[in-house]
Amino acid sequence: MRLLLIHSDFIEYEAKKKTKFAEDPCNPADRLDDALVAFCAVESPDADDIDDVICQTVTAIGEMAGKVECNRVMVYPYAHLSSDLAAPDLAVAALKAIEESLEKAGYEVKRAPFGWYKSFSLSCKGHPLSELSRSITPSEDAVKPEKKHIEHKFFVLTPEGTIHDVQEYMDDSPFAALIKKEIGTAVPVGGEPVHVDLMRSKEFVDYEPVSDVGHLRWLPRGKLVRDLLADYALSLVLDYGASPVETPVMYDLADKAIFEHADKFGERQYRFKSGNRNMMLRFAACFGMFTTMRSMHISPNHLPMKMYELSTYSFRHEQKGEVIGLKRLRAFTMPDMHSLCKDLENALTCFEEQLAIGWKTGRDFGTQLVAVFRCTEEFYSEYEGWIKKIVKDSGVPILIETLSDRVHYWIAKIDLAAIDGQNRPIENPTVQIDVESSKRFGIKYHLADGTEVYPPILHCSPTGSVERVFCAILENTVNQKVAHLPTWLTPTQVRIIPVTDNHLGYAKDIAEKLTKARIRADIDDRDDSLNKKIRAAGMDWVSYVIVVGDSEMNSGNLTVTVRSESEPNKPQKITCTAEKLIEMIGKETSGKPFRPLYTPRMLSLKPRYI
């Protein structure tokens, strides 16, 4: 509770305009002379013991009133004292309780209405005790309300439909790593994940020292990968029939639905004031998509309706000690799709389709994914056959977690995860069945008889955040004989190294052919030795390296080192024409997005970024 107490000659107010949280009925205008004005802002931590906070507030007001010998109190809700406000219902209840407690103590009390834009005038008496501010929190020994006890059960379901104890899967596999993390038996591993060094040493991403922790700078090579991953996600959802939108990154907490949805996420939010409005930075794209949906005229014939946004950016105020590399950030890019479904049966069908997309992303990125399916016991009992079907369709065992009761907006969800070099899960694609948000945001359609229907909504990130996808791809390189990216994601797909300056013109001709064929090719024309240039191509993880000299110029045949097929100290080399190489790379990258080089073609023009 934030409290500002002012001993005044008078206070008068007039309610001008309602907000969505407006208290009604109310006293629209009032005045109190020779009064102690108590400006109050009820804060979210007060919910831990609101009765204790009310008691402390009444005591603080009473002590001040006694010192200034004042028997009149105006309780005035004033949200601008805090950027971490409590839920409106709790705030109103607290303010009413303060009013009633003061009246019982013998004070003459008036209370300005909650949730209105109001004009007010007051005249502060100006004596040494006329102004006081207080910050009140629940006492350390306050008894917090007990959380609902939820029982969690874990077991493994196989594609054959059989149920197994999780202990049967305690081996060294990626699936076992997921199980150990979920049931709490994973052994903590020290040190930084592999990708943290790689993201900087390969000049993909760097830290930004003059920004907040967890906000990164993307360098050209990393920006290219990031953009390709975003293009890939867009192509997936367009093929699936989703319609892209773009919505704001910040929202007004005065909107009841926005506040309630944000409040479910707890304290890990960026909140701030914009003028007299309490705002938040989104932690997902659902805020803007849901407000868009509630303003639409939706017919059952439109459903399922799929809406997509590349959330650039979403913000989560993670604990500073938890922020690491690309895995856990405070600002990240989330491909986010929401599907408004006709009914639960329709939602289950869409769930299957979107889960299949999630599995596909693992294959396309070259990262092995494992899965955990979570639902309430009631949902599992009713839809066990359907759950067995999606496990069968997935073709791999899936960890099942059942909850004794629903505590989230979803009744069922699946999380797919890659496993990093330290045997820890990196959660990426997800699909969730949301049965709360349509009601909260007023998203509805009408049946022929006029009945209102608040339909289920699927939340789906087909890839997971772009940063975590890249994290998983980099972590996966520890499992490769020679570290490499999928060719369609490699910043330089082909590097041409002329033996001498006499071969530079021929190298440029090859590079031009490759570029016209939508292949990213550069030329190492620097004044370095041939061996140093070859090592540099390896350090840059170039997919195909061509050294051109007299033999290549005369024959037209190129000797090409293929990184993905090489072994340590044993490069895999093939001989082919430029046309054949173009055909090979075309087949390898078919169906994947393309962007040109983000760095100069001639390496002599490329600066170092780190």
Curated annotation (Swiss-Prot):
Function recorded in the entry: Catalyzes the attachment of threonine to tRNA(Thr) in a two-step reaction: L-threonine is first activated by ATP to form Thr-AMP and then transferred to the acceptor end of tRNA(Thr). Also edits incorrectly charged L-seryl-tRNA(Thr).
UniProt entry tagged with the keyword Nucleotide-binding: yes
Free-text note on domains in this protein's UniProt record: The N-terminal domain is an archaea-specific tRNA-editing domain that hydrolyzes incorrectly charged L-seryl-tRNA(Thr). Catalysis of tRNA editing is performed by the charged tRNA itself.
Stretches for region Catalytic: 194-486
Protein family per UniProt: Belongs to the class-II aminoacyl-tRNA synthetase family.
Cofactor section: Zn(2+)
GO CC entries: cytoplasm
Gene that encodes it: thrS
Enzyme Commission number(s) of this protein: 6.1.1.3
Catalytic reaction equation(s): tRNA(Thr) + L-threonine + ATP = L-threonyl-tRNA(Thr) + AMP + diphosphate + H(+)
The species this protein was found in: Methanospirillum hungatei JF-1 (strain ATCC 27890 / DSM 864 / NBRC 100397 / JF-1)
Region of interest: Editing domain: 1-144
Subcellular location(s) per record: Cytoplasm
Acyltransferase among keywords: no
Domain of life: Archaea
Name of the featured protein: Threonine--tRNA ligase
Note describing how the cofactor binds: Binds 1 zinc ion per subunit.
SUPFAM superfamilies: Class II aaRS ABD-related, Class II aaRS and biotin synthetases
